[in-house]
Amino acid sequence: MKEKILQLKKEKNAVILAHYYAPAEAQEVADYVGDSFYLAKIAKKSTADIIVFCGVSFMGESAKILNPDKKVLMPDLTADCPMAHMVKPGQIQKMREKYEDLAVVCYINSTAELKCQSDVCVTSSNAIKIVRASPNKNIFFIPDRILGRYVASQVPEKNIIINDGCCPIHASITVEQLKKVKAEHPNAPILIHPECEPELLEISDYIGSTAELIDYVADSPLDEFMICTEDGVDYKLITDNPEKKFYYPNPHPCCAAYSA
């Protein structure tokens, strides 16, 4: 199967992009592996005629927006991010009517329809920087309430209105799960994604996007880590750091949308 995929890729001048959370077999045949923002930039720069995106629907939409003349293929059309649909366009209009000085800041994990109605699109790694630099006092942060709260805690000078959405996978991780793993591996620092609940962020050793967590591990002299994000990232971590050990909350955070 792998040889057939590589043959077709060459024949059709295609590029394969895979998110860190995609299954290992998808990452193995991909030309590029990364987070949604990195892959969007790669898609924009690519000279391929066809973009095969191993991720969820909003990622394919973003690639198509950036490359309207290219064919974008999604291996699984049912792969969808629940959080991307946790705010409706009508909510944005209501907020604009309520606040005259309002900027709608949209997390990249959202539908194309929401992005079109927003003022700026951000990632988990640049959200704080962009919100802080906004000339607007009032910020409607969509769709993730948890990331929105984290941004609000770091930019207290802004009035950040938070939408009630979340990543079900990150939101399912509990303090009790972390404490149990920490008791078993006391020397492993807790690395956590900002989509996790605030009480988890408070006891973490490092907070960062998926790419930032991966970079932290690569740069650290330590040899064991507790990883609090979707466990698909384990493939990249082990591949790049075979001598290091990684522990996850139990049960492992696993998104069915990516593993389909």
Give the residues covered by each predicted segment:
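Active-site loop-to-helix "anion-binding N-cap" substructures in soluble metabolic enzymes
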Residues: 1-227, 233-260
